[in-house]
Amino acid sequence: MADRPRTLAEKVWEEHVVARGEGEGASREPDLIYIDLHLVHEVTSPQAFDGLRAAGRPVRRPDLTIATEDHNVPTVDIDKPIADPISRTQVETLRRNCAEFGIRLHPMGDLEQGIVHVVGPQLGLTQPGMTVVCGDSHTSTHGAFGALAMGIGTSEVEHVLATQTLSLRPFKTMAINIDGQLPPGVTSKDVILAVIAQIGTGGGQGYVLEYRGEAVRAMSMEARMTMCNMSIEAGARAGMIAPDEVTYEFLKGRPHAPKGADWDAAVAAWDALRTDEGAVFDAEVHIDASSLSPFVTWGTNPGQGAPLSATVPDPADFADETAREAAAKALRYMDLTPGTPLREVAVDTVFVGSCTNGRIEDLRAAAEILKGRRVAEGVRMLVVPGSMRVRAQAEKEGLGEIFTAAGAEWRQAGCSMCLGMNPDQLEPGQRCASTSNRNFEGRQGKGGRTHLVSPLVAAATAVRGTLSSPADLD
């Protein structure tokens, strides 16, 4: 297999096959794949540990397993007991399970605590060529390092804990070619929202997406993680970017990154992790980066988006009946009128954070817009770092002072308002400009309405009170 040109995804896959499934094509049996890194949190792991306990099995590789508390944790008063009994039980259960099975845990208050997809990269645990899994759909984030990273279900969590392997069928591959240079004020969040709008929320189903092209190479690691994070919103199994000097610069010196001669050997191996010339993808998409502008969702799935300069679409303009019905239903829930300029849509809340946009670069971008300005009257803004280490760095740079001076709430680390599983939620009817990844009905709280945006758009929106880009503040 190695004598033919291969894609990045194929290379990583084939390096991890423990046992190849019998057969060919659609009838091929699953391969048994070795897992290099298993990330765990409090929501999808309790039943998995119960299964191990019932079967009398240990965790096979606790040294390749790391846990953190993120989904259910509060982002204020973290020194007090968690108020919600279900959330408190899940967090306490994770602590007991990690202690019993010998798994390293970063609890609330720990400097390395935070959202699992922020913590893994910041510790240098995520490295090129790895297979990475977690009981969380946005595990695809780690693909920004050239890793094959996938979200898995609770039964699969148990299987990996017990065997350090997964039974999987090979995925198809899709190249997302983003050529040219991004205009000023356009970010990777705008790019991925545009990709999803183009191919749809099911366009990537069954595929691993590989992001390629000049615009991708020019992105920071934080920006690349944002794009790979939302591959799932396009229906994909994973997203990947070949490692390069940007990757190595990010990783070098991190706690779990190789050191000395091991680092040199690792980089030499990582340099081979790129799609070979002549390799054939199952599908390809081309996007002109120079044509993109700040993007925003108007509906109730991430594919229902448009440039901020557009108006709310008319369902009648959709050619497909299913799309027309979906758009009409979304607009009813979002309480939007066709033809309304998106820049005139007022918000109650702005959220900057999540595993999509809760890293230090995202906070710097938001702070740059907020510096010397105030959050609009009647708007509540939450800024939630993706990890306690990100928060510490932001404090060191004075970003926390900028947020609070502007009237925003500067909080502790956690998933926060990305999802309605902790105290940070919208009230029914409230509208939020959010840097998170999903805008489903009730995602941020029952009856809440979500517009997905970049940190730049979020900060500008907080200042003006309506969906806005930084250019609108000039």
From Swiss-Prot:
Known pathway: Amino-acid biosynthesis; L-leucine biosynthesis; L-leucine from 3-methyl-2-oxobutanoate: step 2/4
What's the Enzyme Commission number for this chain? 4.2.1.33
**Pfam families in the cross-refs:** Aconitase (PF00330)
Residues binding [4Fe-4S] cluster are 355, 415, 418
Per the entry, which co-factors are needed?
A: [4Fe-4S] cluster
**Top-rank EC class of the record's enzyme:** lyase
The entry's free-text remark on the cofactor is: Binds 1 [4Fe-4S] cluster per subunit.
Any GO BP annotation: L-leucine biosynthetic process
Q: Which InterPro entries match?
A: 3-IsopropMal_deHydase_lsu, Acnase/IPM_dHydase_lsu_aba_1/3, Acoase/IPM_deHydtase_lsu_aba, Aconitase_4Fe-4S_BS, Aconitase_4Fe-4S_dom, IPM_dehydratase_rel_enz, IPMI_cat
Q: Which reaction does this enzyme catalyse, per its entry?
A: (2R,3S)-3-isopropylmalate = (2S)-2-isopropylmalate
The signal peptide annotation in the UniProt record is: none
Named from the GO MF annotations, one term is: 4 iron, 4 sulfur cluster binding
Protein keywords: 4Fe-4S, Amino-acid biosynthesis, Branched-chain amino acid biosynthesis, Iron, Iron-sulfur, Leucine biosynthesis, Lyase, Metal-binding
Q: What does this protein do?
A: Catalyzes the isomerization between 2-isopropylmalate and 3-isopropylmalate, via the formation of 2-isopropylmaleate.
- Subunit composition? Heterodimer of LeuC and LeuD.
What the record says about family reads: Belongs to the aconitase/IPM isomerase family. LeuC type 1 subfamily.
Q: Please identify the protein, giving its name as recorded.
A: 3-isopropylmalate dehydratase large subunit
